[in-house]
Amino acid sequence: MDKRSSRLRRAKRARAKISELGANRLVIFRTPRHIYAQLIAPTGSEVIASASTLDKEVSAQIEKTGNVAAATAVGKAIAERAVAKGITKIAFDRSGFLYHGRVKALAEAAREAGLQF
């Protein structure tokens, strides 16, 4: 089993548990160059808000896109967009990525900006 399939197995288990909760979920996807965050409705069919290092608002604040500072900016942006739509309680879906580094920075920035999870 390689690294990617292990991550996808972890993600599958986590998503099954989150779907039982019936809460909006904050989904993270991380590449070496960028980080993406989407707030998805409990049904899984609607994206409520999104932010990434490719957004013009976020990329104007940062120098590089693949570091902790960029992840912090994305976390703050997604939280502001969610709070603007009246959503504060969510479930955090890290997509099988370890809660460390950029994933942790994004989560902590989202918490500081008003999301609860």
From Swiss-Prot:
Establish whether keyword rRNA-binding is in the entry.
yes
UniProt keyword annotation of Acetylation present: no
Q: Show the Pfam families listed in the entry.
A: Ribosomal_L18p
* Any one of the GO BP annotations: translation
Gene Ontology CC, one term: cytosolic large ribosomal subunit
GO MF, one example? 5S rRNA binding
Q: Which InterPro entries does the UniProt entry name for this protein?
A: Ribosomal_uL18_bac-type, Ribosomal_uL18_bac/euk
> Which UniProt key words apply to this protein?
Ribonucleoprotein, Ribosomal protein, RNA-binding, rRNA-binding
Q: What does this protein do?
A: This is one of the proteins that bind and probably mediate the attachment of the 5S RNA into the large ribosomal subunit, where it forms part of the central protuberance.
Record note on quaternary structure: Part of the 50S ribosomal subunit; part of the 5S rRNA/L5/L18/L25 subcomplex. Contacts the 5S and 23S rRNAs.
**UniProt record similarity statement:** Belongs to the universal ribosomal protein uL18 family.
Read off the PANTHER family from this record. 39S RIBOSOMAL PROTEIN L18, MITOCHONDRIAL, LARGE RIBOSOMAL SUBUNIT PROTEIN UL18M
Protein name per UniProt = Large ribosomal subunit protein uL18
Q: Which organism is it from?
A: Colwellia psychrerythraea (strain 34H / ATCC BAA-681)
Q: Which gene encodes it?
A: rplR
